[in-house]
Amino acid sequence: MDMSGESSIKRRRSSIAASAERPAKHLRPENSTLTPGDATPANGTVYAVEDEGDAGRMMPIGPAQADSPEWQATIENVVKSVVSIHFCQTCSFDTDMSMSSQATGFVVDAERGYILTNRHVVCAGPFWGYCIFDNHEECDVRPVYRDPVHDFGILKFDPKAIRYLELTELKLRPEAARVGSEIRVVGNDAGEKLSILSGVISRLDRNAPEYGDGYCDFNTNYIQAAAAASGGSSGSPVVNIDGHAIALQAGGRADGAATDYFLPLDRPLRALQCIQRGEPVTRGTIQTQWILKPFDECRRLGLTPDWEAAVRKAAPQETSMLVAEIILPEGPADGKLEEGDVLLQVNGELLTQFIRLDDILDSSVGKPVRLLVQRGGQNVEVECEVGDLHAITPDRFVTVAGGTFHNLSYQQARLYAIATRGVYICEAAGSFKLENTLSGWIIDSVDKRPTRNLDEFIEVMRAIPDRSRVVVSYRHIRDLHTRGTGIVYIDRHWHPKMRMAVRNDGTGLWDFSDLADPVPAAAPVPRKADFIHLDGVSQAAVSDIVRSFVRVSCTMPLKLDGYPQAKKTGYGLVVDAEKGLVVVSRAIVPYDLCDINITVADSIIVTAQVVFLHPLQNYTVIQYDPSLVQAPVQSAKLSTEYIKQGQETIFVGFNQNFRIVVAKTTVTDITTVSIPANASAPRYRAINLDAVTVDTGLSGQCTNGVLIGEDGVVQALWLNYLGERTPSSHKDVEYHLGFATPALLPVTTKIQQGIIPKLRILNMESYVVQMSQARIMGVSEQWIQKVAQANPARHQLFMVRKVDCPPPQYSSTADALEEGDIILTLDGKLITRVSELDTMYDKEVLDVLIVRNGEELHLKVPTIPTEDLETDRAVVFCGAVLQKPHHAVRQQISKLHSEVYVSARSRGSPAYQYGLSPTNFITAVNGVPTPNLDSFVREVSKIPDNTYFRLRAVTFDNVPWVVTMKKNDHYFPMSEYIKDPSQPLGWLTVSHDRDRHKDGITPDQANLNPDAMDEAFEQVSDVEPDVE
C-alpha cells in the first residue's frame, strides 16, 4: 500500500526456508487431495488458517558489472569482514513475532569481536544466533546493544574462536557518503551468503522509510541509492572504493524499483566508541518525531523569509529543515511543541540536521534543552526536560496464563501517537487470545482493577486463582477509540508459572525468574439456570431439544496429532443428563490433552473431561459433573432406526453467531464418504461413514445441530468434519454432514453402563464400489444378486483403498488385507452398509471373505485395539513436538520409520532454524538409533547445552536426510507430557533439564505456545512480512 508516497517498503531479512544450499526434500508437499472424488463430501466450507507471514514479491536481481582492478582489490578485503548471520527471536516481543531468519553483519572491532548489523536483526526481544565468516568458520554471537530507535545493533563474538581466518575490520567513515559516490553492497543477499551489488548514491537527505505496523526507524535521515538488494542483505556494509563502510543497508522498495535505503553511520560509530570505552550508550528523547521538509513546505507552515535566509546563509547546501511530525501525549514536549512547528535552534544553536539534534539530546539526558521553533510565522521558545530513551524501551516481559506482556514501547507509541503507558500483549495466546488476534492489545484493567503498567498488572495477576473467569478491558492499538470488554478463563494449571524475563546485556541472554505460584482454583458451586423458549416455533419437539444442547469450548495447550488450532468451540448433545454425558464432534475435541468447558443454558459453565474418542466416526464423548448444574437439562432421545433418503425431518442447528435456527426439510441423500486426507500433514479425519445431507441452506451455515422427527426423537447428529488444507490458500476445509444416531448407540449405551468401550478395528480404509466395477474386478454374479437382495436401496460393496500401517506387534501376519481387496463378508455376514462393518469392534480376529485378483479368498484377519492408536505421550525438544505416529499418520503411510514423529514445531526455535519439519521421522541421534521416544530422550539427554548434534531423519515420503542442530536449553528446555489418569489434569508434566536450572524447569517454561507452532510446513515465508 502507499504510505505518504513511500510505497512498498521492505526490510532486508531472509527466510531460511528457501535455502538454496539444500533441496526441500525434508518438507511435506501440499499437492492434492488423497481421497477419490466420489468419496469426497460436496459441501466443504473453507475456513481461514492464521498464516505466519507473507514473503511478498521479490524483484529479479541483476549481477553487478565487471569491476575495475581497484574495486576488485577492495572487495577482496571487505568480504573477510562480512558475516552471514543466522538468528532466531525466540518469542514474540514488541513489534516482532517469534521467527527464524538470516541477515548480514560486518566486523567493526576485530580485537574485541564486535559486529555491526541492523536493529531488526539483533531483535528487540530474546535473540539466539550465530555468524558464518567468509571461510565458513562459525561462531556464536550475542547482542551487546540494540538502539531503541535507529536501525542498528551490535553483536559480539569470541575472536579466539576464529582459527583459520585473519580477522579484519571495516572502518566506519560516515562523512565519506556523498551524492554520486559509487558504492558496493556486500552481504547475504536473498540468503545466498555472499552477493556483491553495485549502486550510486543519489540522496543523503531522505526521511527514514516507513515499514508499516512493525518496527520503523525515525528521527534520522537515510541515504538513497539504486542497488536492488533483497531479503537477507539487512546489515550489509555499504562500502566505497577505499574499502570503508560509509552506510548500513537497511531497506528498500518492493514494487520493482531498484531503490535501496541506507542508514548513516554517525550514530552507530558513536555507540561503538562508547562500548569500546566501556561507557553506557546514552540516548535522550523529548518524545517527538521530526521529519525533514523542504523549504517550500516550511514556508507554507509559516517559516519567515528572514529565518529562511539565515538558514540558507549558514548552511548553503541545505534544502530542508526539521519539522515536528508527532508529539507524544504525556511526553516532555507535550503542550509545548505542536505538530508543524519548524525547528530553528536548540540551546541557541541553529540546527537543520538529525545528527546534531541526536548529539545534543544524547548528551543531555536528565537535563533541560531550549528549543526555538516557528509556529505560523511566530517565534516560540520552549524548554523541555530530556528523558532517557532506554527507560521507555521495554527490556523485560512477563509470561502468565499463556500470554506474554510488557510495557508499551516507544516504538508502538510513536507509530500511533499515544502516550508510552500501558500493558501491551505481544503474544496474545492462552487465556489472553483476545478476539482471535495474536498481538496488539493494550490491557486497561483485569478483574476490575486498573493495569496502567507492567508492575500493576503483575500484582493483579498474582491474586487471581486458577480457573477463574475475570473481566478484562482492552483496546487494540490500531483502534484506540473502541474499548473491548471480555471474559477470560485464567489458566494456571497448564501454564502454572508466572515468569519474568529481564534482558541481560552482559550475557546477551534474557534471565528468567518466577514471580508467583498459582493460587489454587476455588471449589465449583452448583448454579441455577433456565433454557430459552423459542417463540414462533410451532413444533413442540424443537422446544424440548433446546434443553439437550450445551456449548463446548476446547482449549489445547499443545499441538498434537496434526490438529491445526489451539481453541475450538461448538455444540454438543446431552445423551445422559443424569450422568452428564455429551456427544460432540471430534473436530471440536480432537484429543484429551485439553481443557473442556461446557456452557449450559447460556448461563452455567462447568468443566468436562474426555471419556471416549471414536477412532473413525468423528465424535467424542465427554462428561461433566451434573451435580453442579441445577437446570432442566434433558437427555436426547436417540433413534434406533436409520434415517432414510427422502424422509421429512426437522433441522435444528446453531449458526456462526451461536443462535439456534430451525427448518423443516427433507433428506436428500445418504452417501458413504471418507473425509479427504490432508496432504501436508496427516490429522484426524472421519472415514467409512454414511453422511446424511438435507435440502436446506441452513445446513451449510450450521456447524452443529440435529435432525429430529415430529416426536422429538433425534434421527441424526449434525457435525462438523475437519478436512484438508487447500494448497493455494492454506485454508482448512470443513464439512458439515449428518451422522445417523443408531451408529452411536453401541458406544453410548456401554458408557451409560459405566463401561468404557475398547473398540477394535480393521486397519484399513474402504470406499464404495458399484456392481459394474465389482463385476469387472471378479465378483461373481451370485454375489451380485445377493447384494441386490441384501440392500435394495444401494447396490454396493466395499473395496480396501488403503491398509493402515499397523502397530509393530501387529505388523507380521500371514492373513492381511491388501489394497484393492473387495470385502464380501465379515464372519459370514454380507457387508453392503457401513454400519455392518461395526461387527469388527468387539472381535479380535475376523473371518473375512474377499475377492482379490478375481479370486475369492478366506482370511483370518486380526483387528487392532484402538487404545494403541491414541496419543499418550509427547516430548518437546528444541521447539519440536515429538510423539508416536498417531492414527492419521498410520492411515496415510505404508511404513513407519520410527516412533519418533515430528508433529509440530515452534517459531523461533532450533527446530525451525535448522529445518526439522513436521511429518519427519527421527531415526537416530549422533549415529545411535532411536526407534522410540524412550531411546530418543535417553540420547538427547546426553548432549550438552549449546552443542551441535546430528539427527538422522526420514521424510513422510521416505527420503532420508541428516540435520545438524544446536541444542538450546535456556530458551527451549526439553519437557514431556505423559498421560496419567491419576493426575488432576489426566497428564503428568515432566522436565528433563531440572538439574541444569536451579529453579527448575516445567513445560510451561519451554515456549509451549500452540499459537506459535506449525503443525505443517507452509509454503510461505517463516518470518514476519517484509512487504507491508
Swiss-Prot record:
Active-site residues, as the UniProt record annotates them: 120 (charge relay system), 151 (charge relay system), 233 (charge relay system)
Any one GO MF annotation of this record: serine-type endopeptidase activity
InterPro entries reported in the protein's UniProt record: PDZ, PDZ-like_dom, PDZ_6, PDZ_sf, Peptidase_S1_PA, Peptidase_S1C
Gene Ontology cellular-component terms listed: nucleus
UniProt-annotated location(s): Nucleus
Keywords: Apoptosis, Hydrolase, Nucleus, Protease, Repeat, Serine protease
Residues making up the signal peptide according to the UniProt record: none
GO biological process terms held by the UniProt record: apoptotic process; proteolysis
Chain intervals for the UniProt region annotation (Disordered): 1-45
Start and end residues of each stretch annotated as Serine protease: 82-266
Primary localization: nucleus
SUPFAM superfamilies reported for this sequence: PDZ domain-like, Trypsin-like serine proteases
Enzyme Commission numbers on file: 3.4.21.-
Domain spans labelled PDZ: 289-374, 876-957
Family: Belongs to the peptidase S1C family.
Function: Nuclear serine protease which mediates apoptosis.
Entry protein name: Pro-apoptotic serine protease nma111
Originating species: Aspergillus clavatus (strain ATCC 1007 / CBS 513.65 / DSM 816 / NCTC 3887 / NRRL 1 / QM 1276 / 107)
